[in-house]
Regions:
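Generic recognition of stable, solvent-exposed alpha-helical segments in well-folded globular domains
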Residues: 35, 66, 70, 97, ...
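A cross-kingdom feature strongest in bacterial/archaeal respiratory oxidoreductases
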Residues: 5-9, 141-181, 189, 320-408, ...
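N-terminal leader/propeptide and maturation segments of large enzyme subunits in energy/redox metabolism
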Residues: 207-244, 405-452, 510-513
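Generic, well-ordered alpha-helical scaffold segments in large soluble proteins
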Residues: 70, 74, 105, 148, ...
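Short gly/ser/thr-rich secondary-structure transition/capping motifs
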Residues: 124-132, 317-321, 359-362
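N-terminal export/assembly segments and adjacent metallocofactor-ligating motifs
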Residues: 1-206, 221, 244, 337, ...
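A glycine-rich, hydrophobic/aromatic-adjacent loop/helix-cap motif
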Residues: 255-328, 390-394
């Protein structure tokens, strides 16, 4: 391995770690303040992955060249508008979108929305114009960190390390690692976060803690927002949110005259009205005056490419379909890159049925669950053999990747595949790799604060509890320390509270309006009663989830569902 070279962790993770090769070993960089010399277990697992060594066509091993010919011929003989380009987030380097450039020019259908952060992102955009996190220094300079629907110490372990001595408050139905480290844990009922945000705003007003200067000079609609908070008697929130008023008082006492940060995660927005819910939380933050202070602020999964011009983008008139609702069977050819929709997309049964009825190309580093349904598998080169730049959705530092290992035979990078196809079809060429990488390396985005905050002024959210029967369970999913979405060490259990009446190792059948699947039970006090918890990557969970788009952002809403559980 070449020494003194950079390696960016390619994985979909807030931390976007920078590594470097030292004496033939890959080590976390000490110069990157977030990475701070350490990498995680998932990085170690990534290095040990059994990457594809040959291409596969109709279950037979073939060479890379043969696979590229089959792909070109198939694309030439298929109507472009009957093809779909589907990109997952297995590698988040900027060079990954080279192929999207080709498929845009070719005329494929593309996807819109997200399986991840789309709803919440839209909510922030509606209030502040763009989804941008404050500089990480402001998090480090705060006194109190409210962790809202995010498993902060697990899903961004490096960001957590920078602030681990702060006082934490966690709002989560599950007793997560960070909840156990918190001074207050509000074990909230699922999909009631907007109610808690309204209640907290009401208490903020009752205790004269609102930021009058911000409300007068930097915002619009605060009175309308405050009106919504007054719609209901204060005590009625206790039953619906499951959060005692005493804890609400405790939180406000804790934050009074303190520098406050709120780190919001996916958990609050895996629902139909995810954007409205996020906007309520951001509005509470605005009301309390968390924005525009020297320290503190609100963090979410920011738009990591904000302020950069996409060097691989090309304008096209391509049709776009919601990624949550993709019907793979309606295309003659489906090209899947860096994704594993058989496990990660909602409604596994319809995903599999769809894939069985289309010509499926998987462009991937490893033979994943989706490859089982592929006609053609093209091996992507390892991240160690690709030049790239990794931007972060957690903080403002970028990571750089040089080539530290020669690409394995019969593998190809995303950039080279795109270049090859573009030349085959005589399309407009890509910029050179040097030019693209230099642009991202040399461009610094200066943080600009939003001008004015727009409060949410109307609310229309249908709570899940309204339709929940006493035998129903809420579906909750969250990331695991030992896996990265569907990659690495997968846990297929359903986790239930002891009050569920089930016991360890029970075989249960779980049913939802969208499908059913069998699971083995693990009992845990950490799970709130009436919740069924599954780690992300569980091979069965998405048999239960709706392949429908949320209200406004075309994104998935994995938790907009109620479950029935019985012994099987
Ligand atoms: N180790 C590891 N790290 C990862 C990943 C991984 O797979 N493994 N995945 C990466 C990716 S792709 C992403 S997007 C990020 C996401 O990272 P996070 O934002 O932390 O997302 P999740 O773990 O999905 O969910 C966060 C929390 O929301 C809680 N929750 C669920 N429903 C509700 C609710 O209604 N209200 C509230 N208040 N909380 C709720 C869950 O219990 C969970 O603890 O993590 C990244 N980092
Ligand atoms: N029920 C439920 N479902 C969820 C979630 C949840 O919390 N609960 N989380 C959602 C979230 S936040 C996300 S982000 C999505 C993630 O969903 P996906 O984007 O589908 O991610 P993975 O399932 O991890 O699959 C990534 C694949 O990319 C491949 N890969 C890795 N590196 C490269 C590379 O360099 N090049 C190429 N071509 N391929 C590569 C790997 O082999 C791996 O199989 O899942 C979503 N699905
Ligand atoms: S913490 Fe995240 S970015 Fe850092 S090495 Fe692990 S997976 Fe990669
Ligand atoms: Mo994600």
């Amino acid at each position: 391995m070449n020494s003194n070279k950079n390696v960016a962790c390619p994985m979909d993770c807030y931390d976007a770690c920078q590594a470097e090769v030292i004496d033939d070993n890959i080590k976390g960089s000490k110069n990157n303040i977030v990475t701070n010399g350490k990498l995680c277990v998932n990085f170690a697992q990534l290095l040990k992955e059994d990457n594809l060594k040959t291409a596969i066509f109709e279950n037979k091993e073939i060479t890379l060249d043969e696979s590229l010919k089959i792909l070109s011929n198939k694309l030439k003989s298929t109507e472009a508008s009957n093809t779909l380009f589907y990109k997952g987030s297995g590698n988040l380097g900027v060079m990954q979108s080279a192929t999207k450039n080709f498929f845009t020019q070719y005329g494929s259908v593309l996807t819109k929305g997200s399986l991840c952060d789309g709803g919440g992102g839209l909510g922030i955009e509606q209030g502040r114009g763009a989804v941008v996190n404050p500089p990480i220094e402001k998090l480090i300079d705060s006194d109190i960190i409210i962790v809202w629907g995010r498993n902060f110490s697990v899903t961004s372990s490096h960001m957590y390390n920078l602030v681990k001595d702060k006082t934490f408050v966690t709002i989560d139905p599950i007793k997560t690692d960070i909840a156990k480290k918190s001074k207050i844990h509000m074990q909230i009922n699922p999909k009631t976060d907007y109610e808690l945000a309204l209640l907290l705003s009401r208490f903020t007003h009752m205790q004269d803690m609102e930021d009058e200067e911000f409300l007068e000079n930097h915002s619009e609609g605060a009175e309308w927002f405050f009106d919504i908070t007054r719609n209901r008697p204060v005590v009625s929130y206790e039953a619906t949110t499951g959060v005692p008023l005493s804890q609400v008082n405790e939180l406000l006492e804790l934050v009074e005259n303190k520098k406050v940060s709120i780190v919001v995660g996916l958990g609050i927005q895996k629902y139909f009205e995810g954007a409205q819910i996020m906007r309520c939380i951001d509005s509470f933050a605005a009301y309390l005056g968390v924005h525009k202070k020297d320290s503190g602020g609100v963090w979410y999964l920011s738009d990591s490419s904000f302020g950069f011009e996409n060097q691989l983008k090309i304008e096209g008139k391509n049709k776009k379909v919601s990624v949550a609702q993709v019907d793979f069977s309606s295309y003659d050819l489906v090209f899947i890159q860096g994704g594993n929709p058989v496990v990660s997309a909602p409604n596994t049964k319809s995903v599999i049925e769809g894939l069985k009825n289309s010509f499926v190309v998987c462009f991937t580093t490893t033979y994943n669950d989706t490859c089982e349904y592929a006609d053609l598998v093209i091996p992507s080169s390892s991240f160690l053999s690709k030049r790239d730049v990794r931007l972060s959705y957690g903080h403002e530092y970028k990571a750089i990747s040089d080539i530290v290992e020669e690409a394995k035979d019969n593998t190809i990078s995303e950039y080279n595949l795109a270049k090859h196809l573009i030349s085959e079809f005589g399309f407009k060429e890509l910029k050179s790799e040097d030019e693209i990488i230099d642009y991202y390396k040399n461009t610094t985005v200066v943080h600009e604060e939003f001008e004015s905050f727009e409060f949410i002024e109307e609310l229309d959210i249908e709570p899940l509890y309204k339709h929940k029967t006493s035998s129903n369970f809420y579906l909750i999913t969250g990331k695991s320390k030992n896996s990265l979405n569907s990659q690495f060490t997968i846990d297929n259990y359903v986790y239930l509270n002891p009050s569920s009446g089930f016991k360890n190792d029970d075989n249960v059948k779980i049913t939802s309006p969208y499908g059913e699947a069998d699971f083995l039970v693990k009992i845990s006090e950490d799970i709130k009663d009436q919740c069924a918890f599954f780690y992300t990557g569980n091979k069965k969970t998405n048999y239960l989830t709706p392949n429908k788009a949320d209200e406004e952002s075309f994104s998935a809403m994995f938790q907009e569902v109620l479950l029935e559980i019985e012994l099987s």
